[in-house]
């Protein structure tokens, strides 16, 4: 079972993610560890039946013990922690809702199912950083994904 850290799980994006993961029973397949930037030491949520205390989201040693980090904490957190963690030699998977890493060569924007092939290729080729896309663009591409996949779009114009 993978150790998966969650940072930013209380906000709008994170709370929707938690709800969806509970509904899909995703917590049954992982060991979740919940982190906080402001409430460390308090009781962690009990998603999936886990208990414990909130860990310090700035503790690099605690973060390095994780196989996967899922963060919805925002760009400032990502900009501070991500480079330090990678420079320390951490080889885990970083999954981020923030825009900070979108243009990095070693990151893939998650837009499943539109780019499932790109995600799969990235995983097979050692990519370990996955980021969310711009909400408006993502929704548009997801709604048009089937049309693109079936070569039914000649051109797109944006005003």
For the regions a language model picked out, list residue spans one by one:
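N-terminal Rossmann-like NAD(P) cofactor-binding subdomain of oxidoreductases
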Residues: 1-159
């Amino acid at each position: 079972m993978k150790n998966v850290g969650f940072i930013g799980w209380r906000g709008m994006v994170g709370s929707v993610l938690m709800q969806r993961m509970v509904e899909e029973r995703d917590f049954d397949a992982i060991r979740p560890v919940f982190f906080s930037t402001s409430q460390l030491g308090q009781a962690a949520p009990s998603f999936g039946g886990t208990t414990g205390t909130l860990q310090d989201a700035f503790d690099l040693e605690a973060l390095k013990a994780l196989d996967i980090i899922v963060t919805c904490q925002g760009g400032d957190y990502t900009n501070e922690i991500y480079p330090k963690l990678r420079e320390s030699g951490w080889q885990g998977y970083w999954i981020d809702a923030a825009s900070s890493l979108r243009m990095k060569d070693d990151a893939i924007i998650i837009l499943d199912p539109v780019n499932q092939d790109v995600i799969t290729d990235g995983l097979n080729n050692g990519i370990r950083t996955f980021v969310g896309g711009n909400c408006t663009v993502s929704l548009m591409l997801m709604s048009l994904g089937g049309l693109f996949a079936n070569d039914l779009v000649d051109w797109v114009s944006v005003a």
